[in-house]
Amino acid sequence: MRGAARVGVTRRPRALAAGCMCMVALIGCGSQAGSAASTQRQAIERYMGEVEPIRLAVNKLLGGADPILEAFRDRRIAPREAARRMGQLERRFAAYAVDIAAVNPPTAQLRALNAPYADTYVFEDAYLSALVAGLADDELTHLPNTQAAQRAAITRWRIGLTVLARAADAPLPADLQRAGRGEIAPAPSPNGS
């Protein structure tokens, strides 16, 4: 009888210990999943902290192109003056293109999203450079048409970023959903031609 009592006593602590170990393992798995989401959230927040000031500054800067083009179309400024003003805008934009290319996202997923997004700045800079030359020559019929490629890349960036942010419960700027939906390149004439 003594041996039987001893066996029962030994089994209970072992069973209890095994149960506790299983609970600890399950809690650990849950905290790892939470930890991964938290890490991804922090990565997204860091990335947006770098990208958002550039994106907003570019939006504001490009808003300055329309008054230049309107004045050119209405012949309130000469072609050379329009080219000079647009050239100043293009040089400021080129600095932002360098800034966005210098962003180093902390995760592979964000790097994969950022590379094509940064390429849209290259397209825009090339367009602005061609626009400057076209304004100087008073000839705007041969500008590169990169809007569709830019729009698609920006839309893929926005959607990919939204998917990652939802999975990590990370906040995104409220106006981000408009990215890629408006006018991409300043139109040299009111009808876009």
Predicted regions, residues:
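C-terminal motif of bacterial Sec signal peptides marking the signal peptidase cleavage site
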Residues: 26-28
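Hydrophobic helical h-region of N-terminal Sec-dependent signal peptides
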Residues: 18-23
